[in-house]
Amino acid sequence: MNVNGYKIESGADLQKANLKHAYLKGAELSGANLSGANLVLANLFEADLSNSNLTTAILDHADLSEADLSEADLSGANLHNSYLRHTHMIFCNLTGAVLDHADLSHADLTGANLTNAVMTGANMTGVELTGATMPDGSLHE
């Protein structure tokens, strides 16, 4: 699915949508409801997903590099092997999210909540974690 050139209304309801392999590069999805959506292998490079609801969304192998996920809710989301390089995830809720083998290199997770997140094998090179709540519940200073 290629939605390049289409306008997606702010706060769109895409709950449980099948967007597998979707080309959403640079998409404006701020405030969208994508809870439970299938975004496996989706291209969300530079997409604006700030304040969006991505609870329990499936984002395996998705490219979210340089996307804005500030204040987004990704609790319980599956981001296995996803690309989150240079992604803005400020105050993002990642409670219980699966981030195993995800590439988070140089992402900004300032104030993010990672409580109970699974991060086995995740690339954390250069990640900003000031004020973030870590998987074990401790606060990163």
Question: What kind of feature is each model-predicted range?
Answer:
Residues 1-141:
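Tandem repeat scaffolds
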